[in-house]
UniProtKB/Swiss-Prot annotation:
The type IV secretion system VirB/VirD4 is a major virulence determinant for subversion of human endothelial cell (HEC) function. VirB-dependent changes of HEC include massive cytoskeletal rearrangements, a pro-inflammatory activation by nuclear factor NF-kappa-B, inhibition of early and late events of apoptosis, leading to an increased cell survival, and, at high infection doses, a cytostatic or cytotoxic effect, which interferes with a potent VirB-independent mitogenic activity. These changes of HEC require the T4S coupling protein VirD4 and at least one of the effector proteins BepA-G. This is Type IV secretion system protein virB10. Interacts with virB4, virB8 and virB9. It comes from Bartonella henselae (strain ATCC 49882 / DSM 28221 / CCUG 30454 / Houston 1). NCBIfam families: T4SS_VirB10. The lineage of its organism: Bacteria, Pseudomonadati, Pseudomonadota, Alphaproteobacteria, Hyphomicrobiales.
Length: 396
């Protein structure tokens, strides 16, 4: 009843069905494998994020605030040791105890003082950061333009300010009978000759009597010796030599410091004289160089070519020596010479006071009649005693 063909067909159909189911189930297995892989990746990421060691972050120093726990108290002053001191007479003095001032008690209810004492102190740990910030601030301030005031307003304010002039009070010169005032001129005859090649001293003799400022008393007698000094060396173009007169000595042995410069008859500073510019030495050195050069060139031309190389150093050395001689003679400074017996002047640069060495005595003319009934000090008011220009006689 059962046909074998039918069974074979059924078997083939089943195989066909299995093959069809198999083909349909392949996509499902691939999806499952993808899900498994995705799940594994998720597990790996979760494991790596949860169980791996965390990197320690870089610690950044923060500004710490240190709170003050105790009240601010200033440092107590050091006590002064009052030990017995030893005097010059080697006597020990007893120890002295000074009364100490009472301590001031502060009220604890002063809230402002207590708040100031308990105020927190800010401590900055990172100094480099602070320095960098200050430098940045300086750079920013340097880049910013400076705020200049209004120039017109500043000028106007300056114009409104008057010029302040300090007043100078007049003073008395003193007793003019004893004073040679500044600005006086003392004629003097040179006692020694002067040459500016070397520095040295000079002396001169006063040619006439030098009177006081009022012209009544002779303070520097004729024949007074004045000593001075001068420096060496004149610069090129100078024709006057500076001389400083230091001291004057009268024939009676009275000395006084002058510290005054020398002048000529017209009051020009310095001392003139004969100037020697040493033209002969300068021109002679130049001629020497030219002669040496011509001679070396002539000798060089007469030498054969073989000996020219050997003698070139000798010829060049001769030219160098001549050049050095020219340089030395070209820098010779001029020389000023002044002979003895010539007239010079001394310009008094300060007031000369002779009151501590001279004393005046009032003298009377025998032919003059004086009213003795006058109650007057004749020493101070000498015009009553003598009407002549000559007032007094110096007692030395």
């Amino acid at each position: 009843m059962n046909d074998p063909m039918d069974e074979n067909n059924l078997l083939n159909d089943r195989d066909m069905i299995k093959d069809g189911h198999g083909k349909k189930q392949r996509p499902n297995t691939s999806k499952a494998a993808a899900l498994v892989i995705l799940f594994g990746v998720c597990l790996y990421l979760a494991y790596s994020t949860l169980f791996t060691e965390k990197q320690q972050p870089v610690e950044v120093q923060k500004e710490g605030i240190i709170k003050q726990t105790e009240l601010f108290r200033p440092a107590p002053p050091k006590p002064v040791s009052l030990e017995p001191t030893i005097e010059k007479n080697n006597v020990l003095l007893p120890k002295v105890e000074l009364p100490t001032p009472p301590k001031k008690t502060t009220n604890s209810d002063d809230s402002l003082l207590e708040a100031a004492q308990r105020a927190p102190v800010l401590a900055y740990a990172n100094t480099q950061k602070g320095q960098g910030s200050t430098e940045k601030n300086k750079d920013i301030s340097a880049n910013q333009p400076e705020a200049k005031p209004d120039e017109t307003a500043q000028r106007f304010n300056h114009l409104l300010k008057p010029t302040t002039l300090e007043g100078i009070r007049a003073a008395k010169l003193g007793n003019r009978n004893y004073i040679i005032a500044m600005g006086a001129s003392i004629p003097c005859i040179l006692e020694t000759a002067i040459s500016s090649d070397q520095q040295g001293f000079a002396s001169c003799i006063v040619s006439r009597d030098i009177l006081s400022d009022n012209g009544r008393v002779v303070l520097l007698d004729k024949g007074t010796q004045i000593v001075g000094e001068y420096r060496a060396g004149l610069k090129k173009g100078q024709k006057r030599l500076f001389v400083l007169w230091n001291r004057a000595k009268t024939p009676n042995g009275i000395i006084i410091t002058l510290a005054s410069p020398a002048t000529d008859a017209l009051g020009r500073s310095g001392m003139d004289g004969d100037i020697d510019n040493h033209w002969l030495e300068r021109i002679g050195s130049a001629l020497l160089v030219s002669i040496v050069k011509d001679a070396t060139n002539y000798v060089k031309g007469r030498l054969p070519k073989d000996q020219d190389k050997n003698n070139s150093e000798t010829i060049s050395s001769g030219q160098n020596i001549a050049n050095i001689a020219v340089e030395n003679y070209a820098n010779i400074p001029p020389t000023l010479s002044k002979n003895q017996g010539e007239m010079v002047n001394v310009f008094v640069a300060r007031d000369l006071d002779f009151s501590n060495v001279y004393k005046l005595k009032v003298i009377e003319n025998k032919k003059q009649i004086v009213n003795r009934a006058l109650s007057r000090n004749f020493y101070k008011n000498s015009a009553v005693i003598c009407n002549e220009p000559k007032l007094a006689h110096i007692e030395r």
